[in-house]
Amino acid sequence: MTETSYTYNELRRLAKGSDGNDARIAVLGDCSTQHLSTAICGSCKALGIDAAMLDTEFDQVRAMIDDPCSELYAFAPDHAVIYLCAEKLAERFCAEPSEKERLTFAERTAAETAALWQRFSSLRPGARIIHLGPAMPYDGVTGSLGNTTPSSFSYQLRRLSLLLCEAGAALGCVTYLDLEALQGQVGRDSFYDPRMYYIAQMTVSDAALPLLGGAIADIVAACSGRALKCV
């Protein structure tokens, strides 16, 4: 698939015809993921994969993964898409009480995320995790200086991405999908609409959802043997 193959509305129509016989995909996020789930389902359908989707409750990632009796495990997914967005990470970072805590933000967040992966993997062995790495937001405060300032959010976010890649490689059941790279294909202004985040907690615009949904569908297709791709 390519980012120009389908519009979001076309993917939404495709998703309505999916019977869920080929793959079971759960989507967990600390932001709104309803439209993302639709884009994934429609993108899978475009690749010939009928996907059953579970769009879990808003901002219930840890609760769903920690509880063995949650609807996540009752759904028995083949793939779990986990999205911990940069906007919520920024809120947590800004709430850190001192520079000392900010200097270790990436390490602590990576450890927490890896623990979630391990918990899910232990309760749902054989399932694949597709973790959406955070896209870098606009930093009008520190600018380029933030890239070499360890206590800045941009520095910690870049470090977090590296640590998550290392943790995912060690665990073996994680595919790390870099939203920063996808955002670079279409530009930040096209990928992210700040108005939609503050209105509906949506971090990916409808215009960019086909790109993201297609990237996730490509991973699902590769893992199911329907496509050749380095996952």
List PLM regions with ranges.
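Alpha-helical cap/lid subdomain in secreted, periplasmic
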Residues: A15-D22, S37-A39, L47-T56, R62-P210, ...
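Short hydrophobic beta-strand that contains or immediately precedes a catalytic carboxylate
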Residues: A26-L28
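Contiguous, structured surface segment used for ligand recognition
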Residues: S32
